[in-house]
């Protein structure tokens, strides 16, 4: 947690410094909120070898930003996910569970703080098309459960990773000082911690799951 707070303070300082270049310009700050639907990339469960699939999870982001110029803006966002899970039932392919019918589930908890920059690629009368990128710290942990194998379920502790985000979207003004967005984002939050669980006579590796997601979100920006 101390690492996240330190990186958060550094991120805020960098954002503040970058915005100082825009001093004297008639631009505005804004608040934003985004939510939508996301799915994780498929991954293999380390203990059993079962290939896991994602359910549909809900990403939520809150942020504050600044219009640096007519076509450029930057913001600082705090984001998380609601209800995300990688899960699958099938026959294990890894020893010592080979052939055992098992249901494996990985439920992540992800909190990320990102500095994002955006550039309008084209400007039309009704809407703009923009591209963006973000980077910052993420706290990632997961709850791992198994049905069909007793004594293997476990929880991993928080790991601080560097999260990356790429975005392509469109925005439109719906009122004075209010804009809406529709965007696709790819996010890499890194891996959770690995953990060895002692199973009768064997040390079994678990955790170490990589969380990369495809996100489709709608958002709104309010000038302040």
UniProtKB/Swiss-Prot annotation:
Organism: Rickettsia massiliae (strain Mtu5)
One CC-aspect GO term: cell outer membrane
A Pfam family assignment: OmpA_membrane
Highest taxon in the source lineage: Bacteria
InterPro entries: OMP/PagP_b-brl, OmpA-like_TM_dom
Gene3D superfamilies assigned: 2.40.160.20
Keyword line: Signal
Signal peptide residue numbers: 1-22
Positions in coiled-coil regions: none
Protein name listed in UniProt: Putative adhesin RMA_1308
């Amino acid at each position: 947690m101390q690492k996240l707070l330190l990186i958060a303070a550094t991120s805020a300082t960098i954002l503040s410094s970058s915005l100082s270049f825009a001093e004297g310009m008639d631009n505005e700050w804004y608040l934003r909120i985004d939510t939508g639907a996301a799915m994780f990339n498929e991954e293999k469960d380390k203990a059993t070898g079962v290939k896991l699939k994602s359910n549909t999870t809900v990403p939520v982001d809150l942020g504050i930003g600044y219009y640096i110029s007519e076509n450029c803006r930057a913001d600082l966002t705090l984001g998380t996910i609601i209800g995300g899970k990688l899960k699958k039932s099938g026959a294990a392919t890894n020893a010592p569970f080979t052939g055992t019918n098992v249901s494996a589930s990985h439920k992540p908890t992800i909190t990320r703080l990102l500095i994002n920059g955006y550039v309008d690629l084209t400007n039309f009368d009704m809407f703009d098309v923009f591209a963006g990128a973000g980077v910052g710290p993420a706290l990632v942990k997961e709850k791992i459960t198994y049905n069909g194998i007793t004594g293997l379920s476990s929880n991993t502790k928080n790991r601080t990773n560097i999260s990356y985000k790429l975005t392509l979207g469109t925005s439109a003004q719906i009122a004075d000082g209010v804009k809406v967005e529709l965007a696709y984002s790819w996010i890499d939050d890194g891996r959770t911690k690995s953990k060895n669980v002692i199973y009768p006579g064997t040390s079994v590796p678990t955790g170490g799951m990589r969380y990369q997601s495809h996100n489709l979100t709608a958002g709104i920006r309010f000038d302040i």
